[in-house]
Amino acid sequence: MARLKLRKLEEYLQGVDGFEQPKILLEQYPTPPHIAACMAHHMQSQHEDIEGKLVGDLGCGCGMLSIASTLLGAQLTVGFELDGDAVDTFRGNVVEMELPNVDCVRADVLQLIGSKWEKSFDTVLMNPPFGTKHNAGMDMRFLEVALRLANRAVYSLHKTSTRSYIQKKALEWGARGSVVAELRYNIDASYKFHKQKSKDIEVDFWRFEIGTE
């Protein structure tokens, strides 16, 4: 499983069940299988940050990124998710796909600083809330937590418009950030306030290297 090709990985991820009723306050947008596959494949093929590693997934939702890292050979993947419904779906996906070494902890990501999980992971990956509706700055709070939990690297998605700010804050937090790719992130009309069937937003895929103050 550890040497899955990108296309095959995406095929597997298309079988992952998503949110039944997305919750607007938690900004629950699923990570599309194509983007999740590209993220995980890059992490492993370019940096060897998954296979045999301890991987954390913050705000893991129904498990798309956690499952991607497990399929690429993570030694153990632990997802953290506040929403109980999403946790149930995550665990259902894991059972249905018969995946070992992956679990989901129901927890508030923002409460993980100072917990037993600090510096517990080689790699942390996440698709955080962008903080565009009710949670201003939430993605940066997630990033701060991620940098406390990881020993090696953090991978994350952030709106392109915040790039220079993210670069600056990462340095303040003892990490060097680099933009791996610029993406057009398609958000389906999950909520009533979406007038269009789907819309694209410009998003950066970041890699943060720990301990480069």
UniProtKB/Swiss-Prot annotation:
S-adenosyl-L-methionine binds at Q28, T31, G59, C62, D108, V109. Gene3D superfamilies: Vaccinia Virus protein VP39. The lineage of its organism: Eukaryota, Metazoa, Ecdysozoa, Arthropoda, Hexapoda. This is rRNA N(6)-adenosine-methyltransferase Mettl5. Enriched in the brain. It comes from Drosophila melanogaster (Fruit fly). It is found in: Cytoplasm. Disruption phenotype: Flies are viable and fertile and do not display obvious developmental defects. They however show impaired orientation in walking behavioral assays. The gene is Mettl5. GO terms for molecular function: nucleic acid binding; rRNA (adenine-N6-)-methyltransferase activity. The keyword Cytoplasm applies. Keywords: Cytoplasm, Methyltransferase, S-adenosyl-L-methionine, Transferase. Its EC number is 2.1.1.-. CDD domains: AdoMet_MTases. Its main location: cytoplasm. Heterodimer; heterodimerizes with Trmt112. GO terms for biological process: rRNA methylation. InterPro entries: DNA_methylase_N6_adenine_CS (IPR002052), rRNA_MeTrfase/Polyamine_Synth (IPR051720), SAM-dependent_MTases_sf (IPR029063), Small_mtfrase_dom (IPR007848). It comes from the Eukaryota.
